[in-house]
């Protein structure tokens, strides 16, 4: 994984989802107080392309980057990778944003329906632009799809098209629940399937839960998210999360 680091202070590792590393623009102000460590997952530019991208292999690669005491934040597919890596990592905190670990809530009707809509995309012979439009519409992302796709975006979409389906991931609940660091699970109040996954993660990991509406699946861009994240990080650093769960800030589920 190619890694960019900016800022100073405790390390906050930010792992992007499908679609590539956009550089986390809304979180850049945190570089005044944290060292932002932003890996680009293998297979995504500027890394060389791969024929197949696997979350288990990427969890191993992420583990090589992590250092004791890191804060780890994973969005979407990067959230699945982060959950796998965190099970054996010495972290200060873990936050995941709508990880598509749909296997943990496969009994939920909305999850089963969403997986049935996504399954035809892996594999597919759709051209990259049509693939991206269909994916964005299906998962509820607020991403604007340009036409034609710029070369760097097309390269990221081609990487996305060879990712292993994230609902195949086996989340190590026991190890994560036993880990001493606090956990935060965030959803975007836009799709019952992601709500269901996040609800299971909250319960099984004894995690703090937050809902940040306003940007669909593109939670890093949601109004108020960066402030909510920093509040969690601040309490994690001070050790104030031993008993606090702050679930009262969660509005009703969308389904």
Specify the residue positions occupied by each region the protein language model found.
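Active-site loop/oxyanion-hole signature of alpha/beta-hydrolase fold enzymes
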Residues: 35-71
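Catalytic active-site module of serine/aspartate enzymes centered on a nucleophile-bearing elbow/loop
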Residues: 205-255
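Conserved alpha/beta-hydrolase catalytic His-Asp/Glu region
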Residues: 125-161
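Conserved serine/cysteine hydrolase catalytic core
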Residues: 148-220
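Gly/Ala-rich beta-loop-alpha elbow adjacent to hydrolase catalytic centers
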Residues: 74-78, 82
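Flexible "cap/lid" loop of the alpha/beta hydrolase fold
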Residues: 87-122
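Conserved HGGG/HGGXW glycine-rich cap/lid loop of the alpha/beta-hydrolase fold
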Residues: 1-48
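Short beta-strand immediately N-terminal to the catalytic nucleophile in serine-hydrolase-like folds
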Residues: 72-74, 97
